[in-house]
Curated annotation (Swiss-Prot):
Gene3D superfamilies: Alpha-L RNA-binding motif, Pseudouridine synthase I, catalytic domain, N-terminal subdomain, RNA-binding S4 domain
Source species of the chain: Mycobacterium tuberculosis (strain ATCC 25618 / H37Rv)
Family: Belongs to the pseudouridine synthase RsuA family.
Name of the protein described by the UniProt record: Uncharacterized RNA pseudouridine synthase Rv1711
EC number: 5.4.99.-
Length: 254
């Protein structure tokens, strides 16, 4: 059989700037500038040629060091979990759970699962995805992805509490530490504090603050790594932006 003439063969792959544009990174023209400026890597190598073609199914593409997700079957969502709702996709006892909420708002929820949990009486940011590798790494303590909370505690918080929490407090299941602590606001009998830590043990923020002498009255998770709750309303769901996904990948070494 005669070989197909070289000039008639279709070039393999898709132009890199088109791939970046389809991934929502930038317009095609802006993506071209990113490539020329040396901000784009393909499979570990900086690419500056605009004619470069890639196979989105196998190529690992990064912009400014952050990985670009090219698989359009992958879903990444941010949920503001309301207080009183359980962090499960279904509940045998008929209690309200995030699965009920997601089912009403997002199609194809059977393939989605939640990254970690929040107590029923805690509200705030949760991530949902069908990207198993990313979810596994985000939940694994070795990657130490920071999480930030706003906690309303009983009492007036002294200046030295942050130093105490950074040094660590011994709990029943071992010592616990915070990465950052700040007083946000105070009213008679209550204080609003911001706590950042990378631990994921059960009710860790509540137990840590209670052990320090300041029981938590209300708790909201506001940040997971580069993803912030912002002005997202309780019960609302949004798709993560490309840069947020890329920074999560970067945080866990993908």
């Amino acid at each position: 059989m005669m070989a197909e003439p070289e000039e008639s063969r279709e070039p393999r792959g898709i132009r890199l700037q088109k791939v970046l544009s389809q991934a929502g990174i930038a317009s095609r023209r802006a993506a071209e500038k990113m490539i020329v400026d040396g901000r784009v890597e393909v499979d570990g190598h900086v690419v500056t040629e605009l004619g470069t073609r890639v196979d989105p199914q196998v190529a690992v593409v990064r912009v400014d060091g952050a990985r670009v997700v090219l698989d359009d079957s992958l879903v990444y969502l941010a949920l503001n979990k309301p207080r009183g709702m359980h962090s499960t996709m279904s509940d045998d006892r008929g209690r309200p759970c995030i699965g009920d909420l997601i089912e009403r708002k997002v199609r194809g929820t059977k393939k989605l699962f939640h990254v970690g949990r929040l107590d029923a009486d805690t509200e705030g940011l949760m991530l949902l995805t069908n990207d198993g590798e990313l979810a596994h790494r985000l939940m694994h303590p070795s990657h130490e992805v920071p999480k930030t909370y706003l906690a309303t505690v009983t009492g007036s918080v002294p200046r030295g509490l942050g130093r105490t929490l950074r040094a660590g407090i011994e709990l029943d299941d071992g010592p616990a530490f915070v990465d950052d602590f700040a007083v946000v606001d105070a009213i008679p009998g209550k204080t609003l504090v911001r706590v950042t830590l990378h631990e994921g043990r059960n009710r860790i923020v509540r137990r840590l603050l209670a052990a320090a002498g300041f029981p938590v009255e209300a708790l909201v998770r506001t940040d997971i790594g580069a993803v912030s709750l912002g002005k997202q309303r309780p019960g609302s769901v949004r798709a993560l932006r490309s840069n947020e996904i890329g920074q999560l990948y970067q945080a866990v070494g993908l």
